[in-house]
Amino acid sequence: MVVGAFPMAKLFYLGIRQVSKPLANRIKDAARRSEFFKTYICLPPAQLYHWVEMRTKMRIMGFRGTTIKPLNEEAAAELGAELLGEATIFIVGGGCLVLEYWRHQTQQRNKEEEQRAAWNALQDEVGRLALALEALQAQAQAMPSLSALEELREELQEVRGQVCNAHCTSKCQAASSKK
């Protein structure tokens, strides 16, 4: 996620940064007061940072092989506390970005699962409708056609006509035999 692209994300990041500053200040104060914290946690990174910074500056200016004096303990403790505070702010901000990324990925995964479920439901519905269509087509083919019905109707009328004629002639013969 690019922080510059979304104003809300940028505001959120700045808010987290502002909230983490008091935490960083407390860590800095604890680093300045505690001998153990100062000696083992603040001084080594500060001296390393000072050494890398001075070495880089010397190389840029063209000086080679110059020994770099370490910082005095007070300056190193101050620099170490500042580095620790900035690292805390960076870690909190980075953690927020990672959590936002995970949240976005979870939302994306859920959205894809919903789409997949909807797709499967649509495929099932299409399959069910295809079976219903086949059943209706089979019923339509099993039904006699209109021309067959017309033929049956004509045959029925012929039979009726024959029955009527036979019935009428038998009545006529019966009536004539009674006379």
Swiss-Prot record:
Give the primary localization class. mitochondrion
A GO cellular component entry from the record: mitochondrion
Does this entry carry the keyword Coiled coil? yes
Q: Which UniProt keywords apply?
A: Coiled coil, Mitochondrion
> Disulfide bonds, which pairs?
none
Q: Where in the cell is it found?
A: Mitochondrion
One biological process term from GO is: visual perception
- Report the InterPro entries cross-referenced here: OPA3-like
Point out the coiled-coil segments of this chain.
120-143
Q: Domain of life of the organism in this record?
A: Eukaryota
UniProt keyword annotation of Mitochondrion present: yes
What role is this protein assigned? Answer: May play some role in mitochondrial processes.
Name the family the entry cites.
Belongs to the OPA3 family.
What is this protein called in UniProt? Optic atrophy 3 protein homolog
Q: Organism, per UniProt?
A: Mus musculus
Name of the encoding gene: Opa3
